[in-house]
Amino acid sequence: MDLKPNIRRKEKRNLLKGEAALEKKGSIDRKTKNKAYPSTTHDPHQNDDSNIPGLGSGLLERIKDIVQRPTDTQLKGQDSNHKKASLTETKTEKAKVKPKAKKKNSKEKISKSSKQDEHKTDVHKESVSKLSKNLESRNNRDENSAKREKNNSHQVEADTNNATEMVSSNAKKSVYPLYYDSATVKKGLKSGTLFKGTLRILENHRSAFACMEDIPDFYVDGPIARNRAFHNDVVIVEPVMNNDSPTEKSNFLQNGVEKVKIKDHDDELGGAMEHLERLEIKSVASFKGDSRTRARVVAIEKRAEISKIVGILRAPGWSLKNVEYVSKKSSYAIFIPKDKRLPFITIHKNDLSDLSGENWIENILKHHDQLFSVEITRWSIYSRYPMGVLGEKLGNITDVEAYTNALLLENGISSSPFSDEVLNCLPPDDWIISHEEIKKRRDLRNELIITIDPETARDLDDAVSCRALDNGTYEVGVHIADVTHFVKPDSALDKEAASRATTVYLVQKAIPMLPPLLCERLCSLNPNVERLAFSVFWKLDSNGKEIGKRWFGKTVIKTCARLAYSEAQGVIEGKSWDDAVGKPIGGTHTPKDVETSILTLCEISRKLRKDRFAKGAVEINSTELKFQLDEYGMPNKCEVYEQTDANHLIEEFMLLANRSVAEHISKNFSNNSLLRRHASPKEKQINEFCHFLKSMNFDFDASSSAAFNASMVRLRSTFNEELVELFENMAVRSLNRAEYFCTGDFGEKTDWHHYALSFNHYTHFTSPIRRYPDIIVHRLLERSLKNTSPGIDKKNCSLVAAHCNEKKEKSTTVQEDSQQLFLSVYIAEYCKKHDKKSMPVQAFATRISGNSIDVYISEYGISNRVDLSSDDRIKSFIVAPDDSSVKITLFDDSQKTIALTDRFQVYLYSDYSRTFFSIRCSLVSLN
């Protein structure tokens, strides 16, 4: 199929601290490899408190602009897909007409010249004050260090193999400063002149932030200030004075191309390097900076784990202006990573694997539409870009599976078959539960236990039960697959599960954490078969209040019915069993028995939900997409999934089970328990969200989780449903990410708190088939019941937590990028089917700034940007002084005015003209 899925990757919902903390159980099947109606939407069976689509790859394209993050407002509408930018600075009036002609050079831009005041906390002021006294000595130190490296370096090896380029050190000028030595770093951290944080690079590639734990983030402006650091590196930064800002303003031309003369392999790239810098730096002339204290990277404490880098290869001299130009003088190819937070990479002609040789340039040109992997090998202080070695060819960028494999590779997710060593740990295919094992457990095989899951789910790891007792009370049970019976500590199977850490759900398939024999058969709580389980029982009244002690223990169960969410919802809505479900029931149970159980559980779950929000939990609904695929695996239907009472039923009891287990294991193992926490929002992020709503004449109180939720309730009653959907997704971006942690790493139990759920103790217990932390928690719970040691020390518990946090973030990135990929293909298929060039959709204006309008498209739960300056059908436009509206004149002299929150029609199309996939948005139809 001739599709070129190069849609712009949607910004990660959780990449910039956007992981929401609600437990939702969606009815989309995220548990099966081959689905009739597959999707990557959140399944509350996972009990994942990051249910709201959020840090790689995200729900809202450039949503940070909506929240008016200062850095992004200065980017002047330049997108991250190497789009050609007009780099002409204009006068600094608040609003002006922008006449546009058909010729590119006749355009003018709107720009705002008002400078934002520098915001500094006391600790920043003190640090900068200290630094200002020593700036001269520091600069001298850097200069002397660079000279020392030059004097000691008589040659520079360009890369591995035989590609060694000899360059006289006297002809070199360093692009980047040397890193501080360990003694200087230690002294600076102790004195408060240096700070340690995690570097977060935005997708415009220029802007970055050094994220701190207890103080406001530092703004790191540009690649020179980043000093060869990558996204997620743990870095040491030094605040800089305004007049010492590492933006090197004197080193940049007005069009944003750096003047620094680079006497290394960069020289061989010739004019191509200048164009690469234009693409990467964008419009520096229109960049106004950030109000936060600026800093520069002076050392790298820990490199982020970078898997293979995926991208496309271009011949030397290539540019978007002239894709056919080739520089015969250069010995270096240009590699453009798919991840826009990564720099361009140069590759010597001898390091191009099978493409090397006498005809290396011709070979590159023949493979212009292929995806490759690359490993970075070296980054000299004399070279603006790192050097690398070409890896494997992944396939054509028009192939969905090739692109999917690229997503997996760049995020370090293994899709390889399980090894023989792992498979040898499994029981035989005909395994059955022994009588000896049944005697060790509580026998629940005759109890009425049901599962409620997505219709096409294969790995059923949780079930529920409800039995009426005396005096209007009930025994409610949650039963979880006993995975640890099969996955023994330190076995090859255990190590593989720990390495994978999570099942990854793509639109078209799932990559399981455990072999199919376990996740689809022996551990799956399929109906009418005996299965091992780990159960939790509560005695509850009709209001959901606990009466008496909880019971935890190993059980053997036999579920009598398997229901899909839609079927359970039909029962809740009063439909008969035959109309709603129409399935046979196992054992001696009747349809009436099952209906009564579902209705009772639903009623109790409503009380639990109401009580949870009354105690301060945050309710934020997320937009979730589901796709229907045809027989060729292509999307022929895409829609937003809606939560129902059946979803909430499972959600509440999974939350209750996770909280109950967390309280139990942390009481028994206070220093060795693996829990999940969610910190309160950072003041900066929440203030930006509140400020945005203030501009909408709405006062949002975020002083506590209870106040936050109360404000969300008021929000829903004030604005229409589609705007509320937008605000809810923006609210997610103001929240931190929830994370796994070892209790021994936090001395104060208040740090264990889960902000969004408003729980003091929380963990993941209910999805051991597809989450490794749940396996650890099962082991801790079992050992606590046996009154033995925890079986895991604090150090290893901390390592597991950190590893699982990283794997979860990467899996979320892949899942969201997979959705973006299929959405782009769906749009392309729609246009092809209807013989159109674009798809009409309704949108809301969420931000008007400079030369662009940010829009939210509720039909697909995505944000996009309408670039007014690059559309030749727009003659001129005038932005109001307060950025509240824009008046647009088309070349047919028709006019339209668009104000914030206005609903209007835009047109989506899949853009294959650049590198990589991109969903673009136009104000005027392309048809």
UniProtKB/Swiss-Prot annotation:
Q: Where do the segments described as Disordered lie?
A: 1-168
Q: Which GO terms describe its cellular component?
A: cytoplasm; cytosol; P-body
Q: What are the GO BP annotations of this UniProt entry?
A: nuclear-transcribed mRNA catabolic process; polyuridylation-dependent mRNA catabolic process
Where does the source fall among the domains of life?
Answer: Eukaryota
* Extent of Basic residues compositional bias: 1-12, 97-106
Any one GO MF term held by the record is:
metal ion binding
UniProt feature, compositional bias: Basic and acidic residues: 13-31, 107-152
Location of site Important for catalytic activity? 461
- The EC class name is hydrolase
Where are stretches of biased composition, namely Polar residues?
Answer: 153-168
- InterPro entries linked: Dis32-like_C, Dis3_CSD2, DIS3L2, NA-bd_OB-fold, RNase_II/R, RNase_II/R_CS, RNR_Ribonuclease
Location(s), subcellular: Cytoplasm; Cytoplasm, P-body
Q: Which cofactor does it need?
A: Mg(2+); Mn(2+)
UniProt-annotated binding residues for Mg(2+): 453, 462
Q: What keywords tag this UniProt record?
A: Cytoplasm, Exonuclease, Hydrolase, Magnesium, Manganese, Metal-binding, Nuclease, RNA-binding
UniProt EC number = 3.1.13.-
Where this protein primarily resides, as one coarse class? cytoplasm
Could you say which residues form the signal peptide? none
Q: Report the family membership.
A: Belongs to the RNR ribonuclease family. DIS3L2 subfamily.
* Database matches in HAMAP family: DIS3L2 (MF_03045)
Function, in words: 3'-5'-exoribonuclease that specifically recognizes RNAs polyuridylated at their 3' end and mediates their degradation. Component of an exosome-independent RNA degradation pathway that mediates degradation of cytoplasmic mRNAs that have been deadenylated and subsequently uridylated at their 3'.
* UniProt-recorded name of the protein: DIS3-like exonuclease 2
